[in-house]
Amino acid sequence: MKLSLSPPPYADAPVVVLISGLGGSGSYWLPQLAVLDQEYQVVCYDQRGTGNNPDTLAEDYSIAQMAAELHQALVAAGIERYAVVGHALGALVGMQLALDYPASVTVLVSVNGWLRINAHTRRCFQVREQLLHSGGAQAWVEALPLFLYPADWMAARAPRLEAEDALALAHFQGKNNLLRRLNALKRADFSHHADRIRCPVQIICASDDLLVPTACSSELHAALPDSQKMVMRYGGHACNVTDPETFNALLLNGLASLLHHREAAL
């Protein structure tokens, strides 16, 4: 699996791995790259079955497989210890990595994540699946911003959204791969295992997230032994895109604090 690695800003700089959500594209993290590159070696990638890592995914594709293939790719690149920043599905992959490779994951940042899918989130995905089946990729892509962004943010950026729609259609991961990745997301359940995650965790959520209620992050916070929760008042599900200034400040401060906390505990 292909990875994109930034040059380390200094010798032995900590590594931060960015894992996007269901869309799978590493470019989702573009608003974070410039600030992270100054302090960390940053790893981005298109998830298997998407972008520049095309593949046909098995029907039983799982979050555990997503975690294993990423860890194997990191080890092949010479990276054995790393912090993880995951958004939604990416946060699930991050938790799986922390469970399966505890010696490798130094810190986990969960952005609008959850222990197991909430009934409201499931309903949103059911509606989106119906759109996919009835209207194809175009209907799926055109509906996506409604679940990602605040209304006023979208209203002020109509040309940008049109350009994003065209790009998403051109690089659509395919119906079968999308549904198999979505099914993996829906099957994931960390409610009985989260207390085994020992690395420090920063939880970031947005109070106006239409797709994932903030209660999901509260449940995560209660279940994880060593976690802190930060709530953004604005930004929607893709809060790192819509309000990068606020998000980046939370992320940089959180990573610095938790990595120091981790080193002090060793």
Swiss-Prot record:
It catalyses: carbamate + 2 H(+) = NH4(+) + CO2. One of its GO terms (molecular function) is hydrolase activity, acting on carbon-nitrogen (but not peptide) bonds, in linear amides. GO terms for biological process: nitrogen utilization; uracil catabolic process. InterPro entries: AB_hydrolase_1 (IPR000073), AB_hydrolase_fold (IPR029058), AB_hydrolase_sf (IPR050266), Pyrimidine_utilisation_RutD (IPR019913). Gene3D superfamilies: alpha/beta hydrolase (3.40.50.1820). The keyword Hydrolase applies. One of its GO terms (cellular component) is membrane. It holds the Pfam family Abhydrolase_1. It comes from the Bacteria. Keywords: Hydrolase. Signal peptide: none annotated. It is an enzyme of class 3 (hydrolase). SUPFAM superfamilies: alpha/beta-Hydrolases. The keyword Hydrolase applies. Its EC number is 3.5.1.-. Involved in pyrimidine catabolism. May facilitate the hydrolysis of carbamate, a reaction that can also occur spontaneously. Belongs to the AB hydrolase superfamily. Hydrolase RutD family. This is Putative carbamate hydrolase RutD. It comes from Escherichia coli O127:H6 (strain E2348/69 / EPEC).
